[in-house]
Amino acid sequence: MGLTFFDKARELTEELEKTQAESIHQAAKLVADSIMNDGIIQAFGSGHSYAAAIEVCGRAGGLIPSKVIMDPAGGYYESIEGVGSLLTHRLQAKPNDIFFLISNSGRNPMGIELAEWIKSQGCKLIVVTALDASQTAASRHSSGKLLYEFADVILDNRSVQGDAALELEGLEGKVCGTSSFSAVLLLQQTIYEAVELMLEKGYTPPVYRSANIDGGYEYNFAIEDKFADRIFHL
C-alpha cells in the first residue's frame, strides 16, 4: 500500500510552484506595503476554510499585525444572503489594511458580501480559491458574482470541483480534500516573501515567536500591545 495522498501532495506542490509563483509575488508585495504603512492583515475563511485563515493570523512565525475575522456560526449560514453584510457591522478597516478571503468555491453570499464591503473601504483583497471550479460554479448571491471577481490578487489552490481528489475502488465519491494543504503552501510562501521584501527595504517586521519557547510570550505581548486596539476582538 503506497502513500497515495503524499503522492498527490507532491504533484500539487509542483503544480502550485509552476502556476502560482507570480501571484504569490504580487500578494507578498501587497502584504509588505500594508504592514510598512501601518496596516494589518485581516483574514476570513468560512467553515473549514477557517483553518487557512489562522495560517496568517496569530501564529508563530507569522506577522503580529494580524486578525482573524470570526464567524460566530462557523459557516452554518454562509449560503444565506445578508449574513455577510451583518458580519461587516462588527468589522473595522483602514485603507492600508490587507484582507485575505479564503473560499474553495467562492460562490456563497457570506464571502461575496464581505468582499463587497472590503472593496468599499478602499482595501486590497487577496482571494484564495479553486479558480477553475469557481469559474464553473453558479453564484448563490443575487448579484451573480463570485468571490474571485473582487480580488486584487488570486491565489489559485488548484483544487478540483468538490475538493476531494482521490478515488478508491468500491467508493462512489472521492476522498481527501486538497484545498487546506495547498492554502498552507500559498499563504506561508506569501508571508515569507512579504517579510523578505520588508527586510530588503530596511524595515524589520514584527513576527510572532512561539509562546512555547522561553520568553516568547513576553516578546509577543510587548509588540501586540502596540496593535491592541486593532488586532484583538472585544
Swiss-Prot record:
PROSITE patterns: SIS. One of its GO terms (biological process) is D-glycero-D-manno-heptose 7-phosphate biosynthetic process. SUPFAM superfamilies: SIS domain. One of its GO terms (cellular component) is cytosol. Residues 31-205 form the SIS domain. GO terms for molecular function: carbohydrate derivative binding; D-sedoheptulose 7-phosphate isomerase activity. Belongs to the UPF0309 family. This is UPF0309 protein lmo0025. It comes from Listeria monocytogenes serovar 1/2a (strain ATCC BAA-679 / EGD-e).
